[in-house]
Amino acid sequence: MTLEEGLPSADLIVLATPVDTIPLLTVKILNRIAPHQVVMDTGSIKGELCEVVAMHARRGRFVATHPMWGTEYSGPDAASRGAFAGRTAVICERERSDRDAVETVERLYGALGMPLVSMEPEEHDLHTAYVSHISHVTSFALALTVLEKEREEQHIF
């Protein structure tokens, strides 16, 4: 089924594609939806996306979200039952979305057992960057510490 074939029968359209595809895909879908339809995304970057849709005539039908759950794995094999329960979902620019659209998304996340928080896109992106990169920063700092200690001891691997 193509996007054009499936879109008319959907009440809620969930975008869960690679983050670099979401802004243009969101615009493409907003251009085609009916007034009752809701579009939401699940991408990890919100700043660019929210800028791209800011002036769209159907901006109110879009809810920018990010379920804060994931592993190093992706695809269907990475799925696990109950994975979202107790994990936070972020809604960005809640006030720019129509009330009924936000309520639809809240019901979905509520059914998954996910508490909700609201953030501005820039705040979300900053916090997500911290969380996503903390393991890399920690590993790098540890490696530098070990190398410095080895230099002090004049033993370098």
Where do the PLM segments sit?
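Internal alpha-helical scaffold of NAD(P)-dependent oxidoreductase catalytic cores
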Residues: A83-F157
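Rossmann-like NAD(P)-binding element
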Residues: L3-I33, Q37-V38
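Structured loop/turn residues at beta-strand edges in well-structured enzyme cores
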Residues: P8, A57-G60, G82-A85
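General small-molecule cofactor/ligand-binding pocket signal
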Residues: M1, V63, V117-E120
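Glycine-rich, N-terminal phosphate-binding loop of Rossmann-like dinucleotide-binding domains
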Residues: A16-P18, G43, E93
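Predominantly a Rossmann-like dinucleotide-binding segment in NAD(P)-dependent oxidoreductases
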Residues: T71-A89
